[in-house]
Amino acid sequence: RAYATTAMREAKNSRIILDQIRVRTGLEVHIISNSEQRFISYKAVASKAGEFNQIIQKGTAIVDVGFGSAQISLFDKDSLVATQNMPLGSLRLRSQLSKIPVSVEGNRLHIEEIVDNELITFRKMYLRDRQITNLIGIGDNILYLMRRLGIKGGESHVDAETMHVFYDKLSQMTINQIEENFGVNSDYANLLLPAAAVYTRILDITGAEMFW
């Protein structure tokens, strides 16, 4: 079974696309709601039961960056205390940037401005008196990013400083350089910086020490 999420939910031609997928591949793609999508994502994270339960004993933010939106969920001592969906998907951000012809450095600044503006209210409402130690990143782009984060062996996390160094390097790359370094096509290469920006800016505003 295949699922489609935010980008397909909001597409005006979603029925045509789904029909074409069915005709060409035989796959029946089901468009699921935001709550269904998050349930599946969190179920996957929680499948590592021992490690997950240990992590969320301390303040933890789970950040799920999709193509159309991003979901931030805060956990504290095993309990979900807040969750918010925001229009910070990598494809949505890339679409906004495409309207503004800027340099490589300018891309980073514009993305961060968009992300920060969306996070202002969330920070005021949910982070004022809350300590976040861990940030768990999930989503469409996370595997490509984690492969280049220098994680070795059976480890599944890096500290905040390592994440920032990685983000700085990524933000200085051209699309061609990202294609070559990450082994992706140009369409996907365009999405990696927006996704990394969302993870890194949320890492900053929460003050989390570790990125999982």
What are these language model-derived features?
Residues R1-A2, A7-G59, L74-W212:
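Helical "lid/coupling" subdomains associated with nucleotide-phosphate turnover
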